[in-house]
Every structure is written in structure tokens, then in C-alpha cells.
Regions:
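Bacterial N-terminal signal peptides
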Residues: 7-16
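Positively charged n-region of N-terminal signal peptides that target proteins for export
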Residues: 1-4
Length: 174
């Protein structure tokens, strides 16, 4: 009788373990969970770093509605910048949001799109960068940039699609 009870207990424990694993209820320490728990460290520029990169002669900025004017030491407007956040909140690439800063010249034509801090995979980001993807909007007005169809980058589709959507999200607010 003791052997039968012991056998039933072992069978129940085994069945419980199988059922728990099948429903994703196990310890979380398995290689599967460890791989999914690893999120790349944030890469990309802060908004302030992106502004400084786009406008090396910048000495000050001044918020003007959705636009931020970038000025030199003599308070002359060098151009403008916009941050896709909060308009792009919720737009996700492969590993999360892909916020951008868009730089404009003094006549409000795009001079650059800069990816801000994000958690995308560095290899995908390099692939997007190497294609010249961020230059797609250069020279365009807001209106023309909103109409331009930009293709995603093969092999980095989620990342490039989310950048396109982030660009469009903020441009639509201007």
C-alpha cells in the first residue's frame, strides 16, 4: 500500500510539473526565459545630444509650440528641431519604441533624422544606418515628407517601419 501511495504522489508531482511548464508557469530560470529577459542596453542619442550633433554651433534653444528653435551665440536662429515623443509613444520596433529627433534648417526643410535612445538590437540599427535610411527625408518640407513613401530596410523591417511611423507621427502634429 505504501508503494502505491508513493507511486501516486510521484505521478501527481510529475504531472503537475509538466502541466506548469506547458502553461509557462515554471521557474523562469530556463534558457528560454533567460534569452527573452535579456533586453539590449539603451543605444542612441539623448535629445540634447542629437540637437548638438545636428547644430554644432548651437548655444541656446527656445521652445516655440511644437518646434524648438536652435540659436547661435548671437541668438540667430540656425534651425529647428522636433522630438517625436509624445506623438510616437506606443510605436514599437523589434525591441520597443524608436523615438526620433528631426532637424530642420531655418526655412523648415528637413536636414536630418536622428534616432534617440532606444532598445533596438545594435545589428539591426547598423543595417538601417548603413543604407542611408535616415537621409530619406532630407531637403523636404513637412508636407512633402508626410507624402513621401519610404521603404523599410530588408532585414530590419520592424525597426525601420517604426522609425517611419515615428517620423510621420511627429510631422503630423506640425
Amino acid at each position: 500500500m505504501k508503494k502505491l501511495i508513493a507511486l501516486i504522489v510521484v505521478a501527481m508531482l510529475g504531472a503537475g510539473a509538466v502541466f506548469a511548464q506547458h502553461n509557462g508557469q515554471h521557474c523562469g530560470n530556463c534558457p528560454h526565459h533567460q534569452q527573452h529577459a535579456k533586453q539590449p542596453a539603451a543605444v542612441g542619442l539623448t535629445f540634447e545630444q542629437a540637437v548638438a550633433k545636428a547644430f554644432p554651433a548651437m548655444k541656446s534653444t527656445q521652445k516655440e509650440g511644437n518646434w524648438t528653435a536652435v540659436c547661435d551665440a548671437n541668438k540667430k536662429v540656425l534651425g529647428y528641431v522636433v522630438n517625436s515623443k509624445p506623438a510616437s509613444d506606443g510605436i514599437k520596433g523589434y525591441n520597443g519604441e524608436t523615438p526620433v529627433m528631426i532637424a530642420f534648417n531655418a526655412k523648415k526643410r528637413i536636414t536630418g533624422v536622428y534616432l534617440l535612445a532606444n532598445h533596438e538590437t545594435p545589428g539591426y540599427l547598423k543595417r538601417v544606418q548603413d543604407t542611408g535610411f535616415y537621409d530619406n527625408w532630407n531637403g523636404l518640407t513637412v508636407k512633402k515628407a508626410l507624402k513621401k513613401k519610404v521603404d523599410t530596410v530588408s532585414g530590419a523591417t520592424f525597426t525601420s517601419r517604426s522609425v517611419i511611423m515615428s517620423v510621420h507621427a511627429v510631422l503630423a502634429t506640425l
